[in-house]
Amino acid sequence: TWAVASVHGEAARLRALHAKLSERIRADENLVYLGNILGHGDAVGDAVEELLSFRRALLARPGGEFRSIVYLRGSQEEMWQKLLQIQFATDPREVLQWMLDRGVGATLEAYGGSAEEGVVAATKGPVALTEWTGNLRDAMRARDGHNALMSAICHAARTEDGTFLFVHAGLDTERSLAQQTDNFWWGAGGFEEITAPYGGFSKLVRGFDRRHPGIEVAAFTATVDGGCGFGGPLLAACFDGDGELVDTLEA
């Protein structure tokens, strides 16, 4: 299984990584994007286009379809979905500023919006906000495949044999998968301190860590995050059926 770290709108790095990955990945392997395709970088829309293009290229290869290509919901995708419903927030200006402080502005700009427009709409009230978010939705729908991709992202992904659980930022080991909610995209802390299997899975793999440590592999966990979007490279890691790291890529 190949796992791709947070992209954060770095379309050029994603394109370069895909060029390398296309020479390595086999049809009997899974491909998991660990969230945060959106946000921070200056080419969010192009990054989504590259995702869709690479998927089409893989599925068009002779010799059958790939086992699985999965996209996880990261904190950026979660914020974007919440932003599109911001007219229902108790304090939309405060919520918008909170999101802007965490990188959602890049996604706003990718779909024709701006922070300034949002602040003005929030000041005017729910009707103006509804019109503003409606325009953002229309802009996303106008780009073929973008809306469908956002509708298809998963909270977490597991391999059929139960070896792996893939998450965006972490989880709370005291809670079941159904109880995780925001822990998936914001993390619960202590991920690197997990010292026992969770939920019967041999390995937990995440694609975002605020430390951006690169690739860290422990007995029961793995982190894949080189800081793409924050000045670092985009990473991908390949794990075998036993949970061992067997290959890495960087762009």
Feature annotation, model-predicted:
Residues 1-251:
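Feature recognizes metal-dependent phosphohydrolase scaffolds
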